[in-house]
Amino acid sequence: MLTALLLLPACRAQAAQAVFAGGSFWVMEALFADRPGIERVEPGWMQGESRLQRRQVVRVHYHDDRLSYGELLRLYWQAVDVFDAGGQYCDRGTEFSPALYVDGPLQLKWARQSRSQLGLEWGRQPEVRIFAVGRFEPAAARHQQYYQRHSLLYAAYRSVCGYPDGRGFSLPPLLAGSRVN
């Protein structure tokens, strides 16, 4: 019994996951990487309804005792053009269209509520779709940490394409008691 109780805190330390599509996975990886509470960010692909339909995404591994899914959503909403369902900035097509991939009813609730709140604030509904998490396929090694390994090329691409520089975006704290895993 004592052994089981001692193992409980270790189980809690596992990272939660969230999946975001917001155009180029290079840009999304740079947005979430190197932030407190985020363990790692993996660029990759999420399979769509058909075999030929997939989106560039990032899978964010985070510590839900230090950072909530709601806080990740707030960062995401700052970085994407929520009214452009045809892609993001200069990257066009379904592959680059914004979407949230939710894992369970709590993430679904937060995704829907935050999207609705954005719609109320802007006076029109965001074009960001919400799907259940599907099969994640990691991007090839050449795409991993592209923003770090090719920093000058990445900065030029991001700037020419029109993506905002996410380093200036902050994670505003949520209201006390509203933390959701």
Regions found by a protein language model. Give the residues of each.
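Bacterial N-terminal signal peptides
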Residues: 1-9
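Flexible coil/turn and secondary-structure edge motifs
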Residues: 11-181
